[in-house]
Design a protein with these regions (language model features):
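Extended alpha-helical targeting/anchoring segments
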Residues: 1-516
């Protein structure tokens, strides 16, 4: 049964021009993976977002959708908004300003019957967009082969999985922004989209086989996977020494230097996501299909969150959650705990973490009401499949004249992937890294119709680009936070430790292919 009724929808139309219509289904046999395959396979643009909180507890809601109302893509100076009907609008200038401009005509209505934080925008912004925030930071020039600087999808229908109540909300928005559009016509169009999605969902699953032969990671051993890097170990270690010289000279306290690993892949990119969610479950699991390339994320780290409190009259809560300090997982519980204690007693790791907590406090202080910023969780251990981290949580009350986008801009990029002081660290990154970062160390996530933002730092992420029919190149980038007493070889190994989860996910699929 579809809700609200036409009569209720017509009443809601007096409150806004973008109104949700929904139908509830039992999630008896379907999972987010099977639903994506039924609904989104073959679509030019689609997404699937899932969450494993703290690396161990399944998040309540999963979101997926496809066939967006429009796509907003930034390349260099130009941002294009391409609508589903083929209409294209072109913008120039700061993309951080273009996005709110594109959202301005929408007056969405929210329904208390639906889960919080649904609908809206899904996508990413890449690292090089920092030049629109801080002009003193030089970035590498774009080439035609480079991925977009940013891409966001505005959806008017999506599926929401409730993992607790085991049900699915199929949601479509009635769009009243077209001149002359009646409430009845908008309502019927939304109902038609719901019916089409339900029809796809209720079809038998075809063409998706279990990952038979998939082999889980074997301890902390290096994966048997051939890859190349955009820099040699010697070049990376030389960059570490150069960074340490600048730290000793007082230019910076800390800087993050990265390397990018690439490897060929033959098969379905969605299988990479399926493997990654088994190997490296994380709070920000994401599969983005962007027409001819994919971004597959398993980030453990919040970039920024802006959330309403239970009291509608209260200010939004802004959150950053810096992660800094890493150890590999132990092969036994005792070894794991010993590594955790070693991490918490490591002066280098503690110094790095404290600096980044202070940076997070300062970033929030730029957009939060004075006196509200506080650290409510300090230096706890979070464990993931291949590594453990020191994590802290910093919160504040977003100032009344600031939006979620102001929060993101104030904190972009995260200090945990740049350094401190942030601006000088980014200038040094340009000098010490050989090429563009692209999506790496930027942000991905979603913005909902209640003005809330939930984003992750683009780390532990695969970028998948085509090289031929069913042939792809996968790139994985990882960095190490450098301080005065960093050991070059150890920092190089840390980048490999951070990349290991993604490399293992690829290796596991190779095992499947070899046995088939």
């Amino acid at each position: 049964m579809v809700s609200p009724s036409l009569e209720q929808f017509t009443q809601l139309a007096t409150q806004g021009n973008f109104i949700p219509v929904y139908q509830e289904l039992a999630a008896d046999l379907d999972t987010p993976v099977s639903a994506w395959h039924k609904v989104c396979q073959g679509e030019a643009y689609s997404f699937l977002l899932e969450s494993v909180e703290g690396g161990e507890t399944l998040g309540r809601y999963s979101l997926l959708g496809c066939n967006p109302l429009w796509v907003l893509e930034t390349r260099g100076e130009v941002t294009t908004q391409t609508f589903r009907d083929g209409t294209v609008k072109t913008y120039s200038g700061d993309p951080f300003g273009v996005l709110p401009q594109c959202l301005a005509p929408y007056q969405p209505v929210t329904l208390p019957q639906l889960p919080p934080g649904i609908g809206g925008l899904f996508g990413f912004w890449g690292y090089e967009l920092i030049r629109w925030i801080e002009p003193t930071v030089t970035t590498y020039d774009r080439t035609p082969q480079d991925l977009p600087d940013g891409l966001w999808m505005q959806v008017d229908s999506l599926l929401i999985f409730d993992q607790v109540k085991r049900k699915i909300w199929v949601v479509a928005y009635g769009d009243l922004m077209t001149p002359g559009q009646t409430a009845a016509a908008a309502y019927q169009a939304a109902c038609d989209r719901i019916q089409a999605l339900v029809q796809k969902l209720t079809q038998p699953l075809q063409g998706l086989a279990p990952l038979v032969g998939w082999q889980p990671p074997q301890g902390s051993a290096d994966p048997a996977l051939t890859y190349t890097s955009n820099r040699t170990e010697a070049e990376f270690c030389q960059a570490v020494e150069q960074a340490k010289d600048l730290i000793r000279a007082g230019d910076i306290f800390q800087v993050v230097i990265s390397q990018r690993l690439t490897t060929p892949y033959q098969g379905n990119p969605f299988d990479l996501y399926r493997s990654l969610r088994l190997v490296n479950p994380s709070p920000y699991m994401a599969y983005f299909h962007f027409k001819d390339w994919q971004m597959i994320g398993s980030s453990p780290e919040v970039m920024v969150k802006a959330e309403h409190q239970d009291d509608p009259g209260s200010p939004m809560v802004a959150t950053v959650r810096p992660i800094a300090g890493t150890r590999p997982r132990g092969q036994t519980p005792a070894a794991d705990e010993a590594l955790a204690q070693d991490l918490l007693q490591d002066p280098k790791e503690i110094a790095e973490h404290v600096m980044l907590v202070d940076l997070g406090r300062n970033d929030l202080g730029r957009v939060c009401t004075s006196g509200t910023v506080r650290v409510d969780e300090l230096m706890v251990i979070e464990r993931y499949s291949h590594v453990m981290h020191i994590v802290s949580n910093v919160v504040g009350h977003l100032a009344p004249d600031k939006t979620a986008w102001d929060l993101l801009k104030a904190c972009f990029p995260a200090g945990t992937v740049s350094g401190a002081p942030k601006i000088r660290a980014m200038q040094i990154i340009h000098d010490l890294e050989p090429d563009r970062r692209g999506p790496y160390s930027g942000v991905y996530g979603y913005y909902d119709f209640e003005g809330q933002l939930n984003t992750a730092i683009t780390i532990r992420t695969m970028l998948v680009q085509p090289t031929g029919p069913d042939h792809w190149e996968i790139s994985v980038q990882a960095g190490a936070g450098l301080v005065a007493d960093s050991v070059p070889a150890s920092e190089f190994q840390e980048t490999l430790n951070k990349a290991r989860g993604m490399l293992e996910a690829i290796r596991c699929l190779q095992t499947v292919a070899d046995e088939s």
